[in-house]
Regions:
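Acidic/His-rich, divalent-metal-binding segments that scaffold phosphate/diphosphate chemistry
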Residues: 1-83
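An active-site-proximal "capping" alpha-helix that borders the catalytic cofactor pocket
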Residues: 40, 81-96
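Divalent metal-dependent phosphate-bond-processing catalytic cores, especially two-metal-ion Mg2+/Mn2+ enzymes
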Residues: 2-4, 28-53, 64, 116-216
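Acidic/histidine metal-binding catalytic segments
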Residues: 52-60, 97-111
Length: 216
């Protein structure tokens, strides 16, 4: 793995975020996006190591996949386009690293399609390219996101019946997500591990709720 190239990418990402007028006015968003980028890059690294992909390229793609968030996103279209815009921002930097044109295109294609599976340039949809979106999706089911989700939906303010209904629906949705296709066997295994972790958590929560109104 080319640690010097990765260090340069980290510096580029941090500087881009530091130069962002939007992030200067929204430092919490900046901090979250940076932390998220590292988490996705580490998942991409794990997939690349297991699948025999270029690990440095996978880490770079993970670090830069959300770089477009340096720009304020007002509309839903802005958010849907942030993969393509991110690839546009990343390309000159990647070319400056001296990467081969095919490597630049593959990284940029992975960044471009990670939101809605669409790019604005032609390239082969390789398992490497799918790794960016797969890593991003796997991240959505890490431990901290449980806390964030419950806080966002104001779970603590719900009645017991509302909590039970929400947890039941969540478990059903999590089980349905097991059928989702991913680009590699490694990503699929990580995906299933995360889903099982979540299902186990919510099943334990439901068991606690069942013990909350009567002696069983």
């Amino acid at each position: 793995m080319d640690n010097e190239m990765i260090a340069g990418t980290e510096a580029f990402l941090r500087q881009t975020f530091a130069d962002s007028a939007y992030f200067r006015n929204n430092p919490k968003d900046r901090d979250y996006r940076l932390e998220h980028s590292y988490r996705v890059a580490n998942i991409a690294k794990n997939i690349a190591e297991a699948e025999g992909f270029d690990v440095a390229h996978a880490v770079i793609a993970g670090l830069l996949h959300d770089i477009a968030y340096c720009e304020e996103m007002v509309t839903r279209e802005d958010h849907m386009n942030h993969g393509r815009r991110g690839a546009e921002i990343a390309r000159p930097f990647l070319e400056g690293l001296g990467l081969a044109p095919d490597a630049v295109n593959e990284i940029c294609y992975g960044i471009a399609i990670h939101v809605d599976d669409r790019a604005d340039f032609e390239w082969e949809r390789t398992p490497f390219c799918e790794t960016v979106g797969d890593a991003d999706n796997i991240y959505r089911f890490d431990a901290y996101r449980i806390y964030e989700t419950l806080q966002f939906i104001k779970f603590s303010e719900m009645s017991l019946d509302e909590k039970k209904a929400k947890v039941t629906g969540t478990i059903e949705k999590l089980n349905s997500l097991k059928e989702m296709k991913l680009g590699t066997a490694t990503a699929k295994n990580l995906w299933l591990q995360r889903l099982d972790y979540y299902i186990g958590f919510y099943e334990k929560m439901m068991a606690q709720f069942e013990n909350s109104t009567a002696i069983l």
